[in-house]
Amino acid sequence: MQRYPMTPEGKIALEKELQHLKTVERPRITQAIAEAREHGDLKENAEYHAAREQQGFCEGRIQDIEGKLGTAQVIAVKDLEQNGRVVFGVTVTIENLDTEERNTYKIVGDDEADFKINKISVNSPIALGLLGKKEGDEVKITTPQGEVEYEVVSVEYL
């Protein structure tokens, strides 16, 4: 069985979403289906079909979250050996050796990734290229823009 890495914060966020889906969305959709049924003929009842579609999406997401939580490998950065290497959960600053542009990223699980707030998936090309590296290491990473050479500036276990 494949383990699904996530931070403690990521686990809490998924648990909150699951709770919301089960206690708010599921009952709301069930009520919408019941109201749509009262309108009669279900063959041409757009409200009914829309509510059933919402129900399918909601139940699918519930199953998805339950599966991920069931196989979660929660990794707390503070509990890791702080050996200066890039691993899941660390915050890493890298510098593009061509442009001298610096970026700082936190390496997180797939569901936690949000590039707008500099959280990248452990399965992203950048994270995969950085895993195992330490401060001062140079690495070539294939990105959508082509191959880019970076230097690991800092690794923080925050």
UniProtKB/Swiss-Prot annotation:
Keywords: DNA-binding, Transcription, Transcription regulation
Pfam (any one): GreA_GreB_N
Alphabetical list of InterPro entries matching this protein: GreA/GreB_C_sf, TF_GreA/GreB_CS, Tscrpt_elong_fac_GreA, Tscrpt_elong_fac_GreA/B, Tscrpt_elong_fac_GreA/B_C, Tscrpt_elong_fac_GreA/B_fam, Tscrpt_elong_fac_GreA/B_N, Tscrpt_elong_fac_GreA/B_N_sf
Annotated GO biological process: DNA-templated transcription elongation; regulation of DNA-templated transcription elongation
TM stretches of this protein: none
Gene Ontology MF, one: DNA binding
Family listed: Belongs to the GreA/GreB family.
Physiological role: Necessary for efficient RNA polymerase transcription elongation past template-encoded arresting sites. The arresting sites in DNA have the property of trapping a certain fraction of elongating RNA polymerases that pass through, resulting in locked ternary complexes. Cleavage of the nascent transcript by cleavage factors such as GreA or GreB allows the resumption of elongation from the new 3'terminus. GreA releases sequences of 2 to 3 nucleotides.
Protein name, entry field: Transcription elongation factor GreA
Origin species: Acinetobacter baumannii (strain SDF)
Gene it is expressed from: greA
